[in-house]
Amino acid sequence: MKLRVGAALFGLGVLLLVFAAGLPFYVAPSVTKLPYDLEPTTSVAEAKNAKFLKITRVGESVSIEVLQGDLVSSVEVIPQPDDTRDRLPEELKGDAVIWDVYQTVRRSDTSDVVSQYSTELALDRISGAAAPWKEQWLNESGAEQTPVGNVSYSGQIYKFPFGTDKRAYQVFDRDLKRAVPAKFVGTEKIKGIEAYRFEQRIENEVLNTPEASLKPLLGRFAPGATSGQIVYSNTRTLWIDPVTGSYVNVREQQNKELRPDTGTATVLLDADFNYNDDTVTRSVDTVKDNRFKIGLISFWGPIAAGVLGLIALVVGVWLVTRTNDGAARHRADPAVAPGTDPTRTRVDQEPVRDAETAEQPRTEPAGGPLTDEIPPASTNWKSEDPTVPTQRAAHGEVEQR
């Protein structure tokens, strides 16, 4: 029985050691990739006392004005597992996922829509950067039809790589339609999570504004101007979880100015957007959960399996060798003859007697020791011992002393 148990434990130990070695190399990489069935997420940022451009169209009339108030921006990310399976080209299958993203900026007091956009893009499952997919698109005007391939995404957009490094990354800016470096500036604790802080500075960049969009603005704010441009600045601060590459917190200090060729500039946007507390809390909770899964499979799982495997291996070997030693000793013992006492003692040792069964010393009679042996019959022996009676003389003989 011990031999079987030992062999089973030995085999279990080997399996656990193989499992421990395979976890970080074969299983862990699967959890450090964007999943196909990722749940939709929504992040909310708020800007207090912001200045913003509001264009209202009622029939053929258009109202253009700069207002001031609180703004709320919500970004919803919806993964598309079916499109990922069916629409990606062969060179991207297995390595990228398709996401649909929608952003809406509203006034806090009236819920009126200030701006909105929608987009569809492909992201690399490991790096989180935009994948070179020809069918990506971006709709900023709210048009019903959007030309496919009207935007070329590059760099990080909604996620950083798994295992983010302390270095600069290219981060895509939707207003510029290109990626700009975001520099690593340090680490910070956010609700118990150590996050990497990156800053991207965009200063006085001239936006590519269609003439049809620029003319109404010049007519409203600079009637005497014949041309102008919109100048854009943004300081974007990103707090990234280095393990998963997820956004923990985001801040964007945006500014847009209309600068006509004559007249004064007009501020079209001056807003400081920050993730609200609920979004930060949910981001931290998600990061903690994903960190636990990654750590369990890539670190703690292999350690636990390795330790248990070694224990099972050692115990199994010990049981097998102990059983073999016992069998060897059993074979070395001399056989006991049938009918003999296996517990007999050596002749040079005192026998061990039980107190109750030990033989008691005999009391010899006064006449001498008794014996069961009968002396041989003789008529010519006599003893010098006076206590032994002499043999009576035969008839006609003289008794001799």
List each language-model region with its residue ranges.
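Membrane-proximal extracellular "stem/stalk" segments
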Residues: 218-305, 312
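Primarily hydrophobic membrane-targeting regions of prokaryotic envelope proteins
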Residues: 245, 316-320, 401
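Short, cysteine-centered beta-strand-loop-beta hairpins and adjacent loop/turn segments enriched
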Residues: 106-112, 204-215, 257-264
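Extracellular or lumenal secretory-pathway regions
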Residues: 2-163, 277-298, 319-326
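Acidic/Ser-Thr/Pro-Gly-rich, low-complexity N-terminal segments
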Residues: 330-401
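Solvent-exposed coil/turn segments that connect beta secondary-structure elements
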Residues: 49, 201-205, 255
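Membrane-proximal low-complexity regions enriched in glycine and acidic/polar residues
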Residues: 155-249
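Juxtamembrane interface at the cytosolic side of transmembrane helices
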Residues: 2-8, 292-347
